[in-house]
């Protein structure tokens, strides 16, 4: 499953005003998904592609989400899943905001990889414990209802979405094999990550205007310490814990001068995404 997050914001802070980088969507929109998208093989054709602007009524209220099923999905075999959460600019603010995350590269990039996978992204209403519970509930809904390989469930969050997803993977580290933490601060705990061998990729511009890259380095150091405390060697930690903080020149060469939103380029390089997908449970 897939989870997306864009511009960040923390509790008690104003929302960032910079726009996110949003390449055109790659998946064809499919309306009114059929029940045959469930994991069981059926004699009826299974709809695939992009299912936009769905609503799931969960324990903490409605969850507005969209998802993508690869063309070969028919319920006969299980697929990896990415759950990705966008930033503040793409969260749920009512009907006018519905589907605003569908053009975001944090969602579409996973649908273009050679590895076919289910991709899920939600538009949540906050970036605290409620949103983390909703992300977990949505993840479990897809694991139980779709043909998902439970050993290859991944998470990603950008900015505000990263605040949510860092809580999510720490609350239920048993669910996720790896997590991409983009341009955000870490709001979750650390020990459960190491105790459950969750791989973490932290990416933030060194010149991030919103959070500041010191928060990325702090998260890395705390996670590294958690792995050390769990008995991991430095060599083994390097295989599951990764951080990148490109300098301003890296972004300027790409014509990017807004560094917080500019870190969305992490989704443009398949090597970054495939590092996440290289990990599995068990």
Describe the residue ranges of each PLM region.
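Primarily recognizes the serine-hydrolase "nucleophile elbow" in alpha/beta-hydrolase
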Residues: 144-145, 151-194
């Amino acid at each position: 499953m897939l989870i997306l997050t864009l511009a960040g914001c923390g509790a008690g802070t104003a929302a960032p005003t910079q726009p996110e980088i949003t390449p055109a969507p790659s998946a064809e929109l499919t309306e009114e998904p059929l029940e045959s998208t469930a994991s069981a093989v059926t004699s009826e054709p299974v709809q695939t592609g992009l299912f936009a602007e769905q609503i799931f009524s969960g324990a903490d209220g409605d969850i507005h989400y969209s998802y993508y099923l690869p063309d070969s999905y028919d319920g006969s075999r299980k697929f990896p899943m990415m759950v990705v959460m966008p930033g503040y600019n793409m969260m749920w603010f009512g009907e006018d905001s519905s589907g605003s995350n569908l053009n975001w590269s944090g969602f579409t990039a996973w649908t273009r990889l050679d590895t076919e996978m289910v991709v899920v992204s939600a538009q949540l209403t906050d970036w605290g414990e409620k949103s983390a519970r909703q992300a977990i509930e949505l993840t479990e809904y897809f694991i139980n209802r779709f043909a998902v390989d439970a050993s290859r469930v991944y998470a990603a969050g950008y900015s505000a979405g990263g605040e949510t997803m860092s809580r999510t993977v720490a609350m239920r580290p048993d669910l996720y094999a790896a997590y991409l933490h983009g341009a955000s601060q870490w709001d979750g705990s650390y020990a459960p990550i190491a105790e459950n061998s969750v791989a973490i990729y932290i990416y933030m511009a060194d010149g991030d205007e919103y959070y500041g890259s010191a928060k990325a380095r702090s998260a890395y150091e705390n996670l590294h310490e958690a792995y050390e405390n769990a008995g991991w060697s430095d060599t083994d930690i390097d295989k599951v814990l990764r951080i990148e903080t490109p300098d301003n020149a890296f972004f300027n060469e790409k014509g990017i001068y807004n560094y917080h939103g500019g870190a969305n380029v992490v989704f443009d390089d398949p090597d970054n995404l495939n590092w996440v997908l290289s990990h599995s449970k068990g």
